[in-house]
């Protein structure tokens, strides 16, 4: 499918975490190396929403229009209001060990947060801060802000990256970047995952 594309803003270093607000018509996104969050308003004006984001990556809106943020440098999931204010850390450790570097995040309709936790943000690169890894795996987690419960859902990834639900939230799709494939999990009634077979290969001439 061919579509005409138009540049609406430019001059960034490495953009991630775009989220759309259907009510305000605004697009919010992160520039990871610059530790900044920007907002494109009504497709016209870009303004700086936050600075010192600790090399934030993925974003998602929760049910109250707060922004759930994956922070590489602090290895945590944090939350702000829609204006990037009232920052608070929701979860940063699994047991007594730091999370690796939360990468991407989705919020289920009941408010439970699902996120990937690869090691990209601990590698020597412009999008992270080099430091030893405390966990001995790269996984997928869920976190319930209401109860404070953090669940490890899968730990057999090389480096999980993007994730999304099916429209009915019955399935969770997670890509494993180094392996160039996407896996499909069934979301069980208790919030755990089953299955996990490869659903699509992301290989090709331009990849």
Regions found by a protein language model. Give the residues of each.
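Short loop/turn segments that connect beta-strands within beta-propeller blades
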Residues: 40-44, 81-85, 144-148, 186-191
């Amino acid at each position: 499918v061919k579509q005409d594309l138009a540049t609406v803003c430019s001059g960034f270093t490495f953009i991630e975490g775009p989220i759309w607000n259907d009510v305000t018509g605004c697009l919010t996104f992160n520039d990871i190396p610059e530790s900044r969050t920007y907002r494109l308003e009504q497709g016209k004006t870009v303004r700086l929403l936050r600075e010192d984001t600790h090399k934030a990556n993925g974003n998602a809106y929760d049910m109250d229009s707060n922004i759930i943020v994956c922070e590489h440098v602090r290895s945590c999931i944090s939350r702000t209001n829609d204006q990037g204010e009232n920052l608070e850390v929701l979860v940063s450790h699994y047991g007594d060990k730091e999370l690796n570097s939360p990468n991407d995040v989705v919020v289920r309709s009941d408010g439970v947060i699902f996120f990937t936790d690869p090691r990209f943000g601990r590698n020597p690169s412009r999008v992270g801060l080099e430091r030893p890894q405390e966990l001995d795996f790269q996984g997928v987690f869920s976190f319930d802000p209401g109860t404070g419960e953090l669940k490890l859902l899968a730990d057999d990834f090389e480096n999980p990256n993007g994730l999304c639900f099916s429209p009915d939230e019955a399935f969770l799709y997670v890509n494993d970047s180094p392996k160039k494939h996407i896996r499909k999990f069934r979301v069980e009634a208790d919030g755990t995952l089953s299955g996990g077979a490869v659903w699509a290969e992301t290989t090709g001439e331009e990849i």
